[in-house]
Swiss-Prot record:
Membrane among keywords: yes
Keywords associated with the record: Disulfide bond, Host cell membrane, Host membrane, Membrane, Secreted, Signal, Toxin, Virulence, Whooping cough
Functional note: PTX oligomer B binds to receptors on the eukaryotic cell surface and facilitates the translocation of the toxic subunit across the cell membrane.
Upper classification of the organism: Bacteria, Pseudomonadati, Pseudomonadota, Betaproteobacteria, Burkholderiales
Location relative to the cell: Secreted; Host cell membrane
Disulfide bonds: C50-C114, C147-C161, C219-C226
Full protein name: Pertussis toxin subunit 2
Signal peptide: 1-27
Highest taxon listed in the record's lineage: Bacteria
Predominant cellular place of this UniProt entry's protein: secreted
Matches recorded under Pfam families: APT, Pertussis_S2S3
BP GO terms, sorted: symbiont-mediated activation of host MAPK cascade
GO function terms (MF aspect): toxin activity
Annotated source species: Bordetella pertussis (strain Tohama I / ATCC BAA-589 / NCTC 13251)
Length: 226
């Protein structure tokens, strides 16, 4: 069926908007941990500089949460463009468009959306442990926090962080920091202990949860440990 001139003009007028909006509908990275809405700092840091104890929100994290997208559409006004860790967010009158970019590529924009990297979960102070794991991806994060990703058979199992300044377990930092460096360099299997009272978001696009590190035990092949 032929298309008349009026219909064709209408289709051509809305096509750019449809293509622009297609960025919003792209599939998110499967299985990543999405920071909750209350972790977002609305105005972020100036020119890519997220404040201490925060980091830039990523494209995948924003795409993976309809709640985060709805929140940002609600709090942004006008023809506003914000930096993400690896892209940009077009808020306000743009309608909430998420665009891909390179890490740090949009930090010349005035405002970056950042997330607070520490959350009190409300869970009880219960010991959780994970056996036969090795420490990888050592990260010196904000506020002198030291983190590691613990893997088993090459797959991430849990992340854990220790800090000298914040959280309930700051007094254990010196000992745990030395242990982390030791097992990371040696590549030895351990049993790692965490408390899920405090959850962290130091790693971008993490496929594992990260909590407060409370202990490390070296696996002994001659015993039942690990």
């Amino acid at each position: 069926m032929p298309i008349d001139r009026k219909t064709l003009c209408h289709l051509l007028s809305v096509l750019p908007l449809a293509l622009l909006g297609s960025h919003v509908a792209r599939a998110s990275t499967p299985g990543i941990v999405i920071p909750p809405q209350e972790q977002i700092t609305q105005h972020g840091g100036p020119y890519g500089r997220c404040a201490n104890k925060t980091r830039a929100l990523t494209v995948a994290e924003l795409r993976g949460s309809g709640d985060l997208q709805e929140y940002l559409r609600h709090v942004t006004r006008g023809w506003s463009i914000f930096a993400l860790y690896d892209g940009t967010y077009l808020g306000g009158e743009y309608g909430g468009v998420i665009k891909d970019g390179t890490p740090g590529g949009a930090f010349d924009l005035k405002t970056t959306f950042c997330i607070m990297t520490t959350r009190n979960t409300g869970q009880p102070a219960t010991d959780h442990y994970y056996s036969n794991v090795t420490a990888t991806r050592l990260l010196s994060s904000t506020n002198s926090r030291l983190c590691a990703v613990f893997v088993r058979s090459g797959q991430p199992v849990i992340g854990a962080c220790t800090s000298p300044y914040d959280g309930k377990y700051w007094s254990m930092y010196s000992r745990l920091r030395k242990m982390l460096y030791l097992i990371y360099v040696a590549g030895i299997s351990v049993r790692v202990h965490v408390s899920k009272e405090e959850q962290y978001y130091d790693y971008e696009d993490a496929t594992f949860e990260t909590y407060a590190l409370t202990g490390i035990s070296i696996c002994n092949p001659g015993s039942s440990l690990c």
